[in-house]
Amino acid sequence: SEYFYCTICIQKRQTNNLIIMSDLVKEFNDYRGKMNEKLLADNNKIVKRIFNLDTNAYAEGALDVKTKELLGLVASTVLRCDDCVKYHLETSYKEGVTKEEMMEAMGIATLVGGTIVVPHLRRAYEFWEALEENK
């Protein structure tokens, strides 16, 4: 049997030579939701304001949400933030971004970020496949 590293929980998981792709999305969303609730429940004014600013920054404006999410995806990839990449991938997917558009944006991110972002590109591609599988 083979072992695969779960990119969400960084633990070994034994499977029958398959990665259960839908688990990638579910595990990410479950963990993110749980931890965001805890962070917000702590009632830290700065954290709450940052969350609020982030939400408002991605709202419809001169740029549509789809474009803003692609910008967030590129920036997150260049900054090598896997959780941020996953979040922007999922939101982009929900906004109707196509695989071709996502890959073009990720190509720009790889160009700007250099080869050090290639591992993040791989994980992003894997997460996108999981999103498509979950249709």
What are these regions (language model features)?
Residues 2-10, 14-67, 117-135:
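Acidic, glycine/proline-rich low-complexity segments that act as flexible tails and inter-domain linkers
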Residues 53, 70, 87-88, 105:
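A general alpha-helix detector
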Residues 58, 79-80, 97:
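Residues in soluble alpha-helical coiled-coils and helical-bundle/repeat scaffolds
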Residues 67-76, 105-112:
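Alpha-helical scaffold segments that form or flank carboxylate-/histidine-based iron centers
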Residues 71, 75-87:
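Short, thiol/selenol-centered motifs that function as redox-active sites or metal-ligating centers
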Residues 81, 112-119:
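Amphipathic C-terminal alpha-helical segment
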Residues 88-99:
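Iron-sulfur (Fe-S) cluster-binding segments and ferredoxin-like electron-carrier domains
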